[in-house]
């Protein structure tokens, strides 16, 4: 993955970008909010977990043009579920809930973004996903536990508006999915989410 990213950046650095065109170097920063549904099915763990509610997402895409209006990029994203975590028995009986912990999904992968006329775009990324639980009870917000790396996917579609020769501001809808096994076969985590994203793109 590191060699791929370095090669990608080297290719992008050599490409000269013209104004109001999708060529050369590509940088996309996006922040948004929406909904995520998270489930943890226990195997050796004592209880199941579930969190469904408001989420926030941050994305970074970095790469370059490989064909007309087509960008190849590395994708880094993080989704935080801001709702309470419910703890349940394996039979589904609720044991309690807590707001002192929050679930996070992170992904590192590769993707393609394609621009249609009128600056409408579609984007897809696939990579390694990982879940962790964050302790919100103190200022340090320590990570309490993390799963193994699993599968992550993001699909997005939206529109951008040029605000300078090479910068554009955008609005999109992003769907994310992640699934991973916990360490030592304690359980299986999965999550899906839909977020409205606001972005700034240099291209």
Where are these regions (language model features)?
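Short glycine/proline- and aromatic-enriched beta-strand/turn motifs that initiate or cap beta-hairpins
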Residues: 17-86, 191-203
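Predominantly the C-terminal beta-signal and adjacent terminal strand-loop region
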Residues: 36-42, 79-88, 94, 135, ...
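Repeated loop/turn-to-beta-strand initiation elements of outer-membrane beta-barrel proteins
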Residues: 68-74, 119-122, 161-169
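Surface-exposed loop and membrane-interface regions of Gram-negative outer-membrane beta-barrel proteins
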Residues: 49-50, 72-111, 132-134
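Transmembrane beta-barrel architecture of outer-membrane proteins
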Residues: 56, 78, 106, 128-132, ...
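Membrane-embedded beta-strand positions of outer-membrane beta-barrel proteins
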Residues: 27-31, 74, 110-112, 122-126, ...
């Amino acid at each position: 993955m590191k060699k791929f990213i370095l090669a990608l950046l080297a290719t992008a650095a050599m490409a000269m970008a013209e104004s109001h065109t999708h060529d050369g170097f590509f940088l996309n920063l996006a922040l948004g909010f929406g909904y995520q549904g998270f489930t943890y099915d226990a195997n050796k763990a004592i209880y199941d977990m579930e969190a469904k509610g408001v989420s926030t997402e941050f994305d970074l895409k970095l790469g370059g043009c490989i064909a007309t209006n087509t960008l190849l990029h590395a994708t880094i994203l993080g989704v935080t579920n801001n709702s309470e975590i419910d703890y349940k028995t394996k039979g589904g009986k609720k044991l309690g809930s807590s707001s002192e912990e929050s679930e996070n999904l992170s992904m590192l992968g590769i993707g393609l973004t394609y621009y249609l006329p009128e600056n409408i775009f579609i984007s897809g990324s696939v990579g390694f996903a990982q879940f962790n639980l964050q302790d919100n009870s103190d200022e340090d917000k320590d990570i309490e536990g993390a799963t193994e790396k699993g599968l992550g996917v993001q699909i997005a579609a939206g529109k951008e508006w040029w605000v300078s020769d090479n910068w554009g501001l955008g609005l999109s809808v992003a769907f994310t999915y992640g699934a991973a096994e916990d360490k030592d076969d304690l359980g299986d985590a999965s999550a899906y989410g839909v977020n409205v994203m606001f972005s700034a793109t240099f291209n």
